[in-house]
């Protein structure tokens, strides 16, 4: 069949061309999936999408992930004898994160999906560790620290298996919790396995270092802030080279640090790199980025700056000269809008308090 050769050709090109970005790969996988769909070939459509959602992990926006994952779920439900549910259970964890990141998704919808995820783990004989970890992360974000501690204990006591989150991600979440409850020194101690390079994954320790650096700046711990910036910058090199836009909020924290540390030009360089990523992101990534950049801009006395910014930026001008005060107002306004949406969804005031 000619169409299967077209699909195989695209898959070969994806595997053979090492210069392709995740976004390039997603686009080509979608082409292959469209060919399969046009020929009513569910099996090829399924196989291609399993690969496609793997690449979605490096995208800042979760729209593609949610769309293609929904297709996989429907294919499995309609043909349970054709496919293995374990093919996509790991990626289900990413989907949960994207639902929390989108303020348009109600908490009721999230709860229903969480229970579905839990039931699928149980019926496939897996530990509930990733389920508890998700609830731990959610409650930390919402400032429900007693609940967070409850789920942290459940997570840590749950058996580990092939569906469990990697040790570096588990540690990263725990460090976020320690920072949020004011245990900065303990967070700096717990991070040592990452510093010693005993564990790591695609975004950790870069993300972790940026979080500790950000809190160090807020606490006036300048020595620790500089030390963890240095760690973060080294860990970010490959991420920036790979144009991994899903890390935009972490780069935003680096911008904030540099503006406060008197390294303004370097901060603008990172700003120019990360702003296009911001426009590809959504939800919580955008919120974290806008807050960090706004906080950084508050530290500057500069009035105008020459920048090469994307043409889709609301303040873009051909002269490439920008008033810093306009940038401050823009990012504060964006942060306030996102905070309002999240707090309305979450029935809380946690996000807007970040801007006080």
Question: Where do the PLM segments sit?
Answer:
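Solenoid-like repeat scaffolds
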Residues: 19, 33-41, 73-82, 116-126, ...
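N-terminal leader/linker segments that initiate helical-solenoid repeat arrays
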Residues: 1-30, 43-45
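C-terminal non-catalytic interaction modules
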Residues: 276-356
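Helix-turn-helix repeat elements of alpha-solenoid scaffolds
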Residues: 18-31, 60-74, 102-116, 139-154, ...
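Residues that mark the junctions of alpha-helical repeat units in TPR/alpha-solenoid scaffolds
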Residues: 6, 25, 45, 65, ...
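Active-site/pore-lining binding-face segments in mid-to-C-terminal subdomains
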Residues: 223-313
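Short, charge-rich amphipathic alpha-helical segments embedded
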Residues: 31-61, 81-82
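Tandem amphipathic alpha-helical repeat scaffolds
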Residues: 9-19, 49-61, 89-103, 129-144, ...
């Amino acid at each position: 069949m000619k169409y299967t050769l077209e699909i195989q050709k695209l898959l070969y090109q994806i595997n053979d061309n090492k210069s392709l970005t995740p976004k390039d790969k997603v686009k080509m996988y979608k082409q292959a999936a469209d060919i399969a769909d046009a020929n009513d070939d569910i099996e090829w459509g399924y196989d291609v999408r399993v690969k496609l959602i793997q690449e979605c992990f490096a995208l800042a926006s979760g729209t593609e992930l949610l769309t293609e994952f929904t297709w996989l779920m429907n294919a499995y439900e309609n043909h349970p004898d054709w496919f293995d549910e374990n093919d996509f259970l790991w990626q289900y964890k990413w989907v949960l994160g994207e639902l929390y990141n989108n303020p348009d998704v109600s908490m009721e919808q999230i709860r229903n999906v969480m229970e579905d995820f839990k039931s699928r783990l149980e019926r496939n004989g897996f530990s509930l560790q990733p389920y508890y970890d998700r609830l731990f992360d959610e409650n930390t974000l919402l400032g429900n620290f007693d609940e967070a501690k409850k789920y942290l204990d459940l997570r840590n006591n749950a058996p580990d298996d092939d569906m469990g989150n990697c040790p570096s991600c588990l540690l990263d979440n725990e460090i976020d919790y320690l920072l949020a409850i004011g245990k900065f020194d303990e967070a700096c101690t717990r991070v040592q396995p990452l510093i010693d390079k005993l564990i790591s994954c695609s975004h950790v320790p870069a993300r972790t270092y940026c979080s500790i650096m950000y809190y160090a700046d807020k606490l006036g711990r300048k020595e620790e802030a500089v030390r963890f910036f240095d760690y973060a910058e080294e860990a970010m090199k490959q991420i920036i080279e790979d144009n991994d836009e899903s890390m935009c909020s972490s780069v935003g924290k680096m911008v904030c640090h540099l503006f406060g540390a008197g390294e303004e030009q370097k901060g603008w360089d990172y700003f120019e790199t990360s702003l296009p990523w911001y426009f590809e992101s959504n939800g919580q990534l955008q919120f974290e980025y806008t807050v960090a950049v706004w906080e950084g801009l508050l530290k500057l006395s500069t009035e105008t700056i020459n920048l090469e910014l994307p043409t889709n930026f609301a303040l873009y001008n051909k002269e490439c000269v920008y008033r810093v005060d306009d940038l401050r107002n823009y990012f504060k306004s964006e942060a306030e809008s996102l905070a309002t949406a999240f707090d309305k969804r979450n029935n809380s005031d946690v996000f807007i308090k970040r801007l006080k």
